[in-house]
Amino acid sequence: MAERSLAGGKLQVRELRGDAVTIGPEHVEAQESTVTAIDIALEPDETMIGKAKAANATLLQNFPKGFSLDATHHPHVSIFAGFVPTADLPKVYAEADKILAKENYTAWKLTALKYYYIPLGPIGLGGIVVKPTPDLLRLQRELIDAVGPFTVKTATAAAFYTTPTEPDIHPSVIDYIAAFMPDHSGKNFSPHVTIGVGTTAFLDAMLAEPFTDFTFSPASASVYQFGDFGAARNRLKVFAPKR
């Protein structure tokens, strides 16, 4: 079990040992703000989606106020996260497209290793840890080099996707995205697929549950506008996979 503090942009993680994306419009607008919280992500195939949705259903039984993996909470593996001036989004899309177009990522075989969660008071944000690979690390480094120059240091909750019924953004989410490049890339990169929210007591109980490794592949890549809990809420741009 590994723990790191979430305060000040540091991610506190407790490992849990244990046991198709529908593509929408190619390009939609971010919610109106001068800065947008973006997530450049690989979207998994049906193998991972099925596992993530099954775990999500279990968490919702424990904590019904959590979120469902649905049309505005997409299962994904974040490769890059940052705050970008909204006016620069077309440039970001163009730079990301150049990099992703070179990658045959749908042929990659990724391994899901275990559950983890991030404690957030009495609840926790759970996910499935994915083994880092040279391909993932190379892709991340190239995206950081290309898109990083467009980023700003921080933002407010206005940079995120919200709804009238979900208006809030945890400050820790803002801190995490602000610190993503220095603190969560390279040797510190921990790729994962978020599965939802549960009580920490329930997530702790999962420590005794076996987790069987499985493999999956990315099916597509997109840029999202982040919502609360680091969810991929608003798909801004879809990239066609290499054929």
Task: Please give the residue ranges for each predicted region.
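Basic, often amphipathic N-terminal segments
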Residues: 23-120, 133-222, 226-228, 232-243
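Short histidine-centered catalytic/ligand-binding loop motif
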Residues: 127-132
